[in-house]
């Protein structure tokens, strides 16, 4: 197959950041994706309906002229989140609440420190029809970073799902065999997103032959057995797994430093890289469900009506992109060849 046409896809997990950065990130995603679930981990975090609406306005202002791209907003859950916060957010069009264990990722220090205290909030979310999006890692310093996802499933996620079966839960950016199995075996109200980097790479790509800071993300890349389990999950075509890039931009100097930031900025190549993965797996027929259908269905939103066409044509991801403030950012897969390319009119 040398060409494939898909229903216009959506990105069910990304980071736009804020300020000048929106001038880069919003057009990069809007070029292909109709909708995107926007993460709320700004400084300060998006904890109220009013903050979500204001952030949405800033994103809309950064859309390219003529674009009808739609940002889908989320609420940053903390131990101070109230039932009224959830009700107000739902009324304002916020589609989901995001659970970050405190310290799990960029700008998450204000997040949840006592998870059990949030169960009443999860109940309200279920009643309101608001989804729970989960960064599924424990954060205690004595727990090995490669074990934190499995530990979160055992300690928390299994209990949340069991206690509130009507709550729709997205286990975001899963990275392990255990996570893929948990989602596959859970009820129809549990799904997961998978990033391009966790399908394409494993921890050798981070650590062998030198540290590769632009492959560093959280949750961290795992052993190849976990990479293969994720590939197997998407190759089944199961509606429980769908596209979420976790595209997460950081300026070059913040990645290439003594204490580099976590995140892969994949917006310029994500769909093409997913196509490469599915092609390599002999599962191109499953790409449309993963990229364009399963997420919308799980969120209870209409499927998109447009289409995007990819052709089998080699191109090279740019080494750098210059941000509106003049600083460079290194995109994911920089300088590497990709086998699929979006067909432009």
Curated annotation (Swiss-Prot):
Cofactor note as given: Binds 2 Zn(2+) ions per subunit.
Gene behind this protein: pyrC
N6-carboxylysine PTM sites in chain numbering: 98
Binding sites annotated in the UniProt record for Zn(2+) 2: 98, 135, 173
Protein name: Dihydroorotase
Gene Ontology cellular-component annotations: cytosol
GO biological process: 'de novo' pyrimidine nucleobase biosynthetic process; 'de novo' UMP biosynthetic process
Functional note: Catalyzes the reversible cyclization of carbamoyl aspartate to dihydroorotate.
Top EC group: hydrolase
Sites where the protein binds substrate: 15-17, 41, 135, 218, 250, 262
Reactions the enzyme catalyzes: (S)-dihydroorotate + H2O = N-carbamoyl-L-aspartate + H(+)
One Pfam match: Amidohydro_1
Record: active site: 246
Coiled-coil annotated residue ranges, if any: none
Subunit structure: Homodimer.
Pathway assignment: Pyrimidine metabolism; UMP biosynthesis via de novo pathway; (S)-dihydroorotate from bicarbonate: step 3/3
Cofactor entry: Zn(2+)
């Amino acid at each position: 197959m040398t060409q494939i046409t898909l229903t216009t896809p959506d990105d069910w997990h990304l980071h736009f950041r804020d300020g000048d950065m929106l001038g880069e990130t919003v057009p990069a995603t809007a070029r292909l994706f109709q909708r995107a679930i926007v993460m709320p981990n700004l400084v300060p975090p998006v904890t109220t309906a009013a903050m979500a609406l204001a952030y949405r306005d800033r994103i809309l202002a950064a859309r390219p002229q003529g674009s009808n791209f739609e940002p889908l907003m989320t609420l940053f859950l903390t131990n101070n989140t109230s039932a009224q916060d959830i009700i107000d957010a739902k009324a304002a069009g916020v589609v989901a609440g995001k659970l970050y264990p405190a310290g799990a990722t960029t700008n998450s220090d204000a997040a949840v420190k006592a998870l059990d205290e949030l169960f009443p909030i999860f109940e309200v979310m279920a009643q309101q029809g608001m989804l729970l999006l989960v960064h599924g890692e424990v954060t205690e310093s004595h727990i090995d970073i490669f074990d934190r996802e499995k530990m979160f499933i055992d300690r928390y996620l299994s209990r949340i799902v069991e206690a509130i079966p009507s709550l729709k839960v997205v286990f975001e950016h899963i990275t392990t065999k255990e996570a893929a199995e948990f989602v596959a075996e859970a009820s129809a109200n549990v799904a997961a997103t998978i990033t391009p980097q966790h399908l394409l790479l494993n921890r050798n790509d981070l650590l062998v032959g030198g540290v590769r800071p632009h492959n560093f993300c959280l949750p961290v890349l795992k052993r190849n057995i976990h990479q293969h389990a994720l590939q197997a999950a998407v190759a089944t075509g199961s509606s429980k797994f769908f596209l979420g890039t976790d595209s997460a931009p950081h300026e070059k100097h913040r990645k290439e430093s003594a204490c580099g930031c976590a995140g892969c900025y994949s917006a310029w190549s994500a769909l093409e890289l997913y196509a490469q993965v599915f092609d390599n797996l002999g599962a191109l027929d499953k790409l449309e469900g993963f990229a364009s259908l399963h997420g919308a269905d799980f969120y209870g939103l209409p499927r998109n009506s447009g289409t995007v066409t990819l052709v089998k044509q080699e191109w090279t991801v740019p080494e750098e992109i210059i941000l509106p403030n003049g600083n460079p950012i290194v995109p994911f897969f920089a300088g590497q060849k990709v086998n699929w390319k979006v067909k432009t009119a």
